[in-house]
């Protein structure tokens, strides 16, 4: 009797799914994309069009996730079903923090991973006068340049803790004296950091900005020299 009971239940379920398929209840009609903050969402939308009209139970959704993960700028993605006919896609992106020019322009994320620029149109600081050998910047992998990686870490630190300064940076320069400089977006302010304790120098720059209050701004200076202990040397524009 118990076998007969389970056979009846199985038959009812099978008939239900066949009926639902016949009525197209479980056909994907909507795809929602979340989490695209830094990069162009249209490349995900193009791929999502391919799963419209799929049955929501279709095992090919796993293949679709693998296709998304082929993009270097995506760390992970989660695809979830919202019955009866909606797919939600959550994207986890890499965070772009700087640009560098090798044989082509390259985005560097917060971990120093090299990414293509075609999916991102953000205004980012450019790392200038660093080694440009293409082998130092393998796409989808961490830069092989320790100097560049340390500079990326500094840019990330500045972005997280002193966002107003970060947003004003046009170039981060490794100069001919092997010292680090910042060129602001106004094109006229040069900030000399020196060679060491660079995070502290960014802190000092922020404190200097605070002491100016509303009277002036760091952009009002031609250069700001932070290389020396207990003093800041400035020249007005």
Model segments located where?
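Short polar catalytic/cofactor-binding loops
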Residues: 35-38
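Charged, solvent-exposed interaction patches on well-folded alpha/beta domains
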Residues: 1-32, 42-55, 62-66, 70, ...
